Curated annotation (Swiss-Prot):
GO molecular function, one term: phospho-N-acetylmuramoyl-pentapeptide-transferase activity
The protein, known as: Phospho-N-acetylmuramoyl-pentapeptide-transferase
Reaction(s) the record says it catalyses: UDP-N-acetyl-alpha-D-muramoyl-L-alanyl-gamma-D-glutamyl-meso-2,6-diaminopimeloyl-D-alanyl-D-alanine + di-trans,octa-cis-undecaprenyl phosphate = di-trans,octa-cis-undecaprenyl diphospho-N-acetyl-alpha-D-muramoyl-L-alanyl-D-glutamyl-meso-2,6-diaminopimeloyl-D-alanyl-D-alanine + UMP
Cystine bridges: none
Family: Belongs to the glycosyltransferase 4 family. MraY subfamily.
Keywords (A to Z) from UniProt: Cell cycle, Cell division, Cell membrane, Cell shape, Cell wall biogenesis/degradation, Magnesium, Membrane, Metal-binding, Peptidoglycan synthesis, Transferase, Transmembrane, Transmembrane helix
Length: 359
C-alpha cells in the first residue's frame, strides 16, 4: 500500500507544479486551442487557451512510477516490471502521436491536425508493438504480461485467440480506448476527472489481484496476472497525475490536455485492461468513454444512411449543452455517472471473486 500512496503523491505533485509552467510557456509561444467552427457558441471563448497539457500528465505518471520504484529500494519493494513498462510505453507512444496532432493544429491555426490515415497508422503501430511484446517476457512462473484468452475479470479459457488474432484484438482495444477518451475531452475537466475515477478503480482491482495472486496465495479465486502490484502503481500514478492536472483544467480551464493527453490516457486504460485480464470489465468502468465514442459512431452511421442526426451534435456531451444544460452541469452529472459505473465495476469484480471462492 505504501507504493500506491507514494505513486499518487509524486504524480500529483509533479503534475500540479508542472502544469502552470506549461501554461506560461505555451502562452508565450502562442500554442493556443482552436475550437470547432460548428461547436457550441459558448466554446468560442475558449479559443486561445493553451493546449498540449497532456505533457504534464505523462510526465507526472512517469515520475510517479519511477519515483515509487526508487523509493521502493528503501523498503525492499518489487522492481520495475515488463507489464508496467509496456503500459507506460504504449501510453507514451500514443501521447507522441497526439502531440504531433496538437502541434499541427497550432501551426495551421485550425482544429485539424494529423490526417485520419496518419493518426490511425500511429495508433495501429503502437497497438501492434504492444500486442506482440505483451505475449513475450515470460517470467519464472510462466506468466506473460498479457494472455491470449479473452478476459472478463479473469481469463475465459474457452475463448483463446491465436497470436495473430490477439495482436488484431489489441489494435481494436487500443484504437477504441484512445479515441474514446479523445472524444470525451471536449468539456473542461471531463476527461481528466473521469480518468482519475477509472484509474482509482483499477488501483483497487489490481491491488486485490496482487493480494490474491496464484503465485503467492494459491487457492480458489486467485489471479494469474503477471505484475498486478506494478499495474496498481501505474494506475495510482495516473490517477494522481490526472487530479493534479484537473486543478488547472477544471472549468474555466486554464489549459487543455489536447490529443497529447487524451490519446495517452486511452492507452493507459487499454494497456491496464489487457495486462490485468479485465478487457470486458473495462467497458463497465469506462462506460462514459464508451458512450461518448458510440455517440459519434451512431451519429455518423445514422446520418449517412438516413440523412438525419440522432444528436444535435456529437460527441453527445455537446448535445446536452445545445439542449440548454450549462457546461458545468454536464461535467458534474457525467462525473457522477462515471463514479456509479466505477462502483458497479468494482462490485462486479469483487462479486466474481466471492462466487469463485464459494462465499
Amino acid at each position: 500500500m505504501r507504493q500506491i500512496l507514494i505513486a499518487v503523491a509524486i504524480a500529483l505533485t509533479v503534475s500540479i507544479l508542472l502544469t502552470p509552467a506549461l501554461i506560461r510557456l505555451f502562452t508565450r509561444q502562442g500554442f493556443g486551442h482552436h475550437t470547432r467552427e460548428d461547436g457550441p457558441p459558448t466554446h468560442h471563448a475558449k479559443r486561445g487557451t493553451p493546449s498540449m497539457g497532456g505533457v504534464a500528465i505523462i510526465a507526472g505518471i512517469w515520475a510517479g512510477y519511477l519515483g515509487t520504484h526508487l523509493a521502493g529500494l528503501a523498503f525492499d519493494g518489487e522492481g520495475i516490471s515488463a507489464s508496467g513498462l509496456l503500459v507506460l510505453s504504449l501510453a507514451t507512444v500514443l501521447g507522441i502521436v497526439g502531440f504531433l496532432d496538437d502541434l499541427i493544429k497550432i501551426r495551421r491555426s485550425r482544429n485539424l491536425g494529423l490526417n485520419k490515415t496518419a493518426k490511425t497508422i500511429g495508433q495501429v503501430a503502437a497497438a501492434v508493438l504492444f500486442g506482440v511484446l505483451a505475449l513475450g517476457f515470460r517470467n519464472a512462473n510462466g506468466l506473460t504480461p498479457a494472455s491470449a484468452d479473452l478476459s472478463y475479470v479473469r481469463e475465459i479459457a474457452t475463448v483463446t485467440l491465436a497470436p495473430g488474432l490477439f495482436v488484431l484484438f489489441c489494435v481494436v482495444v487500443v484504437s477504441a480506448w484512445s479515441n474514446a477518451v479523445n472524444f470525451t475531452d471536449g468539456l473542461d475537466g471531463l476527461a481528466a476527472g473521469s480518468m482519475a475515477m477509472v484509474t482509482a478503480a483499477y488501483v483497487l482491482i489490481t491491488f486485490w489481484q496482487y493480494r490474491n495472486a496464484c503465485v503467492t496465495a494459491p487457492g480458489l479465486g486467485c489471479y494469474n496476472v503477471r505484475d498486478p502490484l506494478d499495474l496498481a502503481i501505474v494506475a495510482a500514478a495516473t490517477a494522481g497525475a490526472c487530479i493534479g492536472f484537473l486543478w488547472w483544467n477544471a472549468a474555466p480551464a486554464k489549459i487543455f490536455m489536447g490529443d497529447t493527453g487524451s490519446l495517452a490516457l486511452g492507452g493507459i486504460i487499454a494497456g491496464i485492461s489487457v495486462t490485468s485480464r479485465t478487457e470486458i470489465l473495462a467497458v463497465v468502468l469506462g462506460s462514459l468513454f464508451v458512450a461518448e465514442v458510440s455517440s459519434v459512431v451512431l451519429q455518423i452511421l445514422t446520418f449517412r444512411t438516413t440523412g438525419r442526426r440522432v444528436f444535435r451534435m456529437a460527441p453527445f456531451h455537446h448535445h446536452f449543452e445545445l439542449a440548454g444544460w450549462a457546461e458545468t452541469t454536464v461535467i458534474i452529472r457525467f462525473w457522477l455517472l462515471t463514479a456509479i459505473a466505477c462502483g458497479l465495476g468494482v462490485a462486479l469484480f469483487y462479486g466474481e471473486w466471492l462466487a469463485a471462492i464459494g462465499a
